[in-house]
Amino acid sequence: NAIQERFDQGRGSVGLADFLRRAGIRFILLRNDLQRAPGLVDPILTHQALAQSPGITRVKSFGPGVGGEPYLEKGGHRVVINQGWQSSYPALEVYEVHDGGGQFVQASTAPVVVGGTESLLSLADQGVIQDQPTILAQDLSRSDPSPGSVILTDSQRARVREIGSLNKAYSYVLSPNEDTRFVDPRDYLSVDAQKWRTQAKYEGISSLTVSSSKSDAGADLGRGPSAAMDENPSTYWVSAALDSDPWLRIGLDQPMALGEITLTTPPDSPDPQVVSVQTEGHLTDQVKLRAGVPQTISLAGTRTSWVKVLGETNNGFPMSLAEVSMPGVSVQRVLRLPAVPAAWGAPAAILLEAALDQTAACASVDLAVRCLDISSSGEEDHGFAREFTIPQGAGYDLEVTGQPRGGDALESLIQRDRLISIQADSAVVSDPRGSALAAIDGDPGATWIADPDADVLAAFAHDLPDEMRSDRVIA
């Protein structure tokens, strides 16, 4: 899964060569002749990820060229292929991992990793480990004496798996007992391995459950139930498309008298959505929610230990909620790491990693940057929180790696103190490589594309340092 995620995002990995060497892998066979289909990684992203991974080079190719030009022209008309994500590759390519091959070391020198095998690639990326073998904590007993060097990670997360699928074949991270509504298997983990999982917990409420979610296994991970209570109107929960009886239920920490609840639907949701709200001993009348408009519903001050929002009728569309708020209730979702046994002492290193599972929107294709209108979102696009305990106090050097979030704030930062600036009414992607900045960067391979679904006509403003006369605009 760790390698699959890198390829799906077109994201290179400085530790990938070490990761493969540890597994005894020397060669990678890349099949460019396979038919593209949903659920498979686009070859454009695979090539980009491999090109950005040091220690891995192409050494051989076979067969005829497949693919082709990103567009076709005839009679003055142009047809774009796969939204521009198209190039020509040999049918088969062989990549070599330098100095690949297996190795043996003494077990006493191998570090113990608390987490799953997927953490090994991230640990190699950060330089915590190289290509030496490791031991997983799940292969040891908690009663064993200190195994030596211990590394704590949040990688083995409690998810439901869509067995048989390769790409995005897992759900958002689950809280304890939340997986009871799923048909898909939680994961094929041994009883010992399940004790080392990282699980979600909610602070401020006792539980948050839904009838279904678009962020179930194989779907959009950013549309889970917590998105409806994160105080961020740009994120939202969406029920599964075939859920005929959708609902969202909030378990309170303790019974309380609730006078009202405020519901907000996404701006692009069906208008209206019809819902009702149920508490212990009270059910409201049906209420029509207008898209993007907060609606406060009276709960008559009833004392209750839970609140349930029921979708009544939506003409076949999924139910969606951007924000659910109640006076006196503040919610934060936290991922809680497994506890390290006291006998093992403090970990030598701790790795906490945000879920970077949003599908890449822009990619480099033959020296040009091409961006797609991709609607999927990541589980932790807007921040993350972790909770863990260690057996004893210890000192650590803190290292933080981040990446910029696309949007108006980033574009303003990039243009700070520049003689010229540019603003656009919309963009089809949030990636700055596809923003209005691409129109003035001097690179004909980078392009600004307006959002075709925007409510306004596509336009951008170019601010100059002073008044000047111009007799032409070149685009």
Please describe what each predicted stretch is.
Residues N1-A475:
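Extracytoplasmic
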